[in-house]
Amino acid sequence: MSKKLYIKTYGCQMNVYDSVKIQDLLYPFGYESTEDIKEADIIILNTCHIREKAAEKTYSELGRIKKLQNTRKQEGLNPAIIVVAGCVAQAEGEEIFSRTPYVDIVVGPQSYYNLPELISKVVRHEKQLIDLDFVEEAKFDNLPEQLYPQGASSFISVQEGCDKFCTFCVVPYTRGAEFSRSVEQVYRESLKAVSNDAKEIILLGQNVNAYHGKGPKDKIFTLADLLKCLAQIPNLARLRYMTSHPIDMTDDLIKLHGTEPKLMPFLHLPVQSGSNKILKAMNRKHDRDYYFNIINRLREARSDIVLSSDFIVGFPGETEQDFEDTLDLVHRVKYGQCYSFKYSPRPGTPGAIRTDQIPEHIKSKRLTILQQELATQQLAFNQSCVGSTMRVLFDRDGKFEDQIIGKTPYMQSVYIHNPNKSLLGKIVDVIITKAALNSLTGEIL
């Protein structure tokens, strides 16, 4: 009889990728995934530490799991093994056992390949096991081959960690220094994904355009080199990459957006602020003019490219003028979609110890104003697509029985009616008939 594995994933697409790899890792040991936490023999929370709210969600969920464990005991059932993985595990370590002593395993994002051994120790009645080692090479060398097909769109991790040390960010402390997988590893995993019917590959990294992996004859490949290599894979239709840092947008990568048709005309390029003063305080290593120059060059290379970004409001010391500078940047760039957040002090980061923290009510007010402007731009872009024909990759079911959902080249969700689901996994021409803030509606030509 198979054992059941339940994984709840928080945060970024890298965590989504890691969760898939954990499934692949534990499958040979008899664990099959379930979406029902009540039947799980192992419960894994793959956590995010980028903001305080995200971290506290972990502890709230652990509280609910404790109640589930108590119910099991009352019914005479064995309790599940509880694992806290990911960036909260890396950042808080032993503190997790102090706050939630019923947790069995704490494992960092570079160490989860040791989960089979850690789980076997818990089965042998060892408790409160922790593994937070930072050996990036070991993680990638021990990743299993893809067992669970990800569908029409497949995420592949090519780079982890960050050397930029932005003063608001915990990534260098939870994911470590920048490390890139070899070209051979990435190419082999990409071939496997395409053999499992993936039409699109999305390359992942905390700072993906800093990729510098070893290729044939020990040549160092840039991200542009890697993309050119992957573009040669037969039956692969689309390539994307995320998340990028403006300082690593090299000439060859910018030019590739104009020459490689498989590279989609959509780029997530976080700027965080439009104020030079705040950019310097954040240690972003560039100013607003540098960012504008990158945007202009991308649009010169490919005129139909659409941009996305991240913004943080209320960073310590942010004045009304600094915030106005951010709004000005948004107005000038004109984004297709964006993500925006209030600054959240993270323990251990330089921003957290600054004495000029912004009051919450001011942060909330600024976030509302910014999000209204970003929503206006996103809706305008979506509405501009009505009446046009777009190539859509259908990759998942909709809420309704005869509905499926796909993605345009610009990462917009498109809903259509397809009663027999025959278009799942295919790229087809769709005429856009309706636009909303977060989605499009279309019809097959």
Curated annotation (Swiss-Prot):
Cited CDD domains: Radical_SAM
GO molecular function per UniProt: 4 iron, 4 sulfur cluster binding; metal ion binding; N6-isopentenyladenosine methylthiotransferase activity
Enzyme Commission designation: 2.8.4.3
Domain of life: Bacteria
Keyword terms of this UniProt record: 4Fe-4S, Cytoplasm, Iron, Iron-sulfur, Metal-binding, S-adenosyl-L-methionine, Transferase, tRNA processing
Domain TRAM: 383-445
All copies of domain Radical SAM core, residue ranges: 148-380
Cofactor note: Binds 2 [4Fe-4S] clusters. One cluster is coordinated with 3 cysteines and an exchangeable S-adenosyl-L-methionine.
Subunit comment: Monomer.
Protein purpose: Catalyzes the methylthiolation of N6-(dimethylallyl)adenosine (i(6)A), leading to the formation of 2-methylthio-N6-(dimethylallyl)adenosine (ms(2)i(6)A) at position 37 in tRNAs that read codons beginning with uridine.
HAMAP family tied to this protein: tRNA_metthiotr_MiaB (MF_01864)
Family affiliation: Belongs to the methylthiotransferase family. MiaB subfamily.
Name listed for the protein in its UniProt record: tRNA-2-methylthio-N(6)-dimethylallyladenosine synthase
Origin species: Rickettsia prowazekii (strain Madrid E)
Name of the encoding gene: miaB
